[in-house]
Amino acid sequence: PARPAVLRYTDPPAVLLWGIGNERAGFEAGDNPAIWKAVNDVAAMVKKLDPNHPTMCVTAELGGARIARVREASAIDIHGINSYGGALSLAERYRAGGGTKPYVLTEFGPPGVWEIPKNDWGAPPEPTSTEKAAFYRRAYDEAVRGAPGLALGSYVFAWGHKMEATATWYGMFLSDGARLGAVDVMTELWSGRAPSNLAPVVEPLVVQGTPRVDPGAELRVLAQVTDPEGGAVRVRWELRSESGEYNTGGDARPVPPTVEGAVLESRGDGALVRMPRDPGPYRLFLYADDADGGAATANVPLLVKGEVRTPM
């Protein structure tokens, strides 16, 4: 319940504001009147209990009536917006849609799986960690630094390791704690100073031939990984079954199993892989790390041709 939570956390200095609902707009158009009345009623109650902290309501992007409904909610002070690929145009779209209240970019990161065109068997190509780091910078520059007086700040997603769609899509760290390039970018943007040692840089993987192969076929994939300081970079390759769950809604998922013995050659400039005999989608991952806690990732979707049998 909201009342006990407000009374409990009114005084701790770590509390910045009160978030009244996350992506609770209801209906595709975001105009469910019952939900918006409830949001405003709760916000009004919170303001009476704690007049020293502002209230915020978070919406998934800006579509439909979301801007108007937050603007009309008299007890809501701040519009929280979760935006990924759309962060580059967020400030412009917010103003054009009639947004007047200050906003917080409450979730941002690389383009979401739902925003990436899928290949011909339905698998989304994932940007490299280097490409994602560049996108974090652009998103922050456009949606936060590019909107002074309107944007109050932001929260990156996800500060940790997470299996969602793939083992590496959203996490800014690997499971062993190694930091990816996005951490270096945000460290610089937040502090004004880049880390003295940067994470490795990786180019998109290149499949020699076609990524759609016969069962048991061998496949060579090329890579290019460099260390900004010129140091040594260690690499490892893993072939995993594809999860196939691309719209998980944020729920935690187990990491798909590694195909043992699939990687025949593992080098910094590429890998030779023997694909499984079982038909279906797979994904080949490259992990690169330096000696200073930095890492880079890239992957490519692959397909073994044939009829995929569904377990009975």
Residue ranges and their predicted role:
Residues 2-33, 56-67:
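Active-site groove signature of glycoside hydrolases
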Residues 232, 293-297:
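A structural signal for beta-strand boundary/capping segments at domain termini and interdomain linkers
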Residues 297-305:
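C-terminal edge beta-strand
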Residues 95-250:
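Substrate-binding clefts and catalytic carboxylate motifs of secreted carbohydrate-active enzymes
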Residues 37-145:
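Extracellular glycoside hydrolase catalytic/binding regions
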Residues 234-274:
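Exoplasmic/lumenal beta-rich domain surfaces
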Residues 280-284:
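Exposed beta-strand face motif in extracellular beta-rich ectodomains
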